[in-house]
């Protein structure tokens, strides 16, 4: 669960109701790194991904008072970023249909709750190697679920894939990671399935 949610909602309200520039800047700083990395997975250009995310935030500012009607700002921003990136691709390359296997993503970290499991530096290294060895689509789905804390259903909608595909890709990712660290995924609740 995103611990920043109440703060994000308050910032969203401040922007919507009072055009609060400071709140807008905080939202930008909070979401920009993840959105830029997500846009990069489509565009493969740092400059274009930065422009795409900037365009998304310009639209957020222009939305003004209607911003309060958005119930899940994080999902809205990821969806807007995806759409903006795909529009850039259409304009730049004439590429109409980008397949999820074409996505490229660099994971900044793999996060697991330390209360659930004590992981040594060697295990972290093994996990990182396992994640990096995942197919591109599988890696992107894993990142969106585990790092960005999106639900399976949200990832399915965001990537225009079936819910079953998301479930299968997460199962594949978790099996590969579990295998890399010598962990039997079937005999433990280490990896919890996100609620649909």
Give residue spans per PLM region:
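Internal acidic/polar
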Residues: 5-9, 95-117
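Structural recognition of an alpha-helix C-terminal capping motif at a helix-to-coil junction
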Residues: 37, 51-58, 71-83
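C-terminal edge and immediately downstream basic/flexible tail or linker adjoining helix-turn-helix-like DNA-binding
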Residues: 3-5, 158, 174-196
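Arg/Lys-rich amphipathic alpha helix in sigma70-family domain 2
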Residues: 79-99
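Helix-turn-helix DNA-binding module
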Residues: 129-132, 136, 140, 148-165
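N-terminal module of bacterial RNA polymerase sigma factors
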Residues: 1-33, 196
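Amphipathic, Lys/Arg- and hydrophobic-enriched alpha-helical face
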Residues: 28-46, 131
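Sigma70-family region 2
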Residues: 17, 57-72, 92-93
């Amino acid at each position: 669960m995103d611990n920043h949610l109440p703060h994000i909602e308050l910032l969203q309200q401040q922007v919507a109701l009072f055009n609060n520039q400071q709140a807008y800047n905080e939202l930008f700083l909070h979401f920009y790194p993840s959105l830029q990395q997500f846009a990069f997975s489509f565009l493969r250009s740092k400059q274009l991904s930065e422009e795409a995310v900037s365009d998304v935030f310009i639209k957020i500012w222009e939305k003004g008072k209607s911003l309060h009607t958005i119930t899940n700002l994080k999902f809205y921003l990821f969806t807007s970023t995806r759409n903006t990136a795909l529009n850039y691709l259409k304009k730049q390359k004439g590429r109409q249909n980008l397949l999820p296997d074409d996505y490229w993503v660099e994971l900044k970290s793999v996060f697991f709750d330390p209360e659930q499991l004590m992981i040594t530096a060697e295990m972290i290294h093994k996990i990182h190697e396992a994640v990096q060895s995942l197919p591109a689509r599988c890696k992107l789905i894993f990142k969106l679920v585990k790092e960005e804390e999106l639900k399976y259903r949200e990832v399915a909608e965001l990537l225009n894939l079936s819910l079953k595909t998301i479930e299968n890709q997460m199962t594949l990712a978790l099996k590969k990671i579990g295998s890399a660290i010598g962990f039997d995924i079937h005999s433990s609740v280490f990896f919890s399935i996100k609620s649909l």
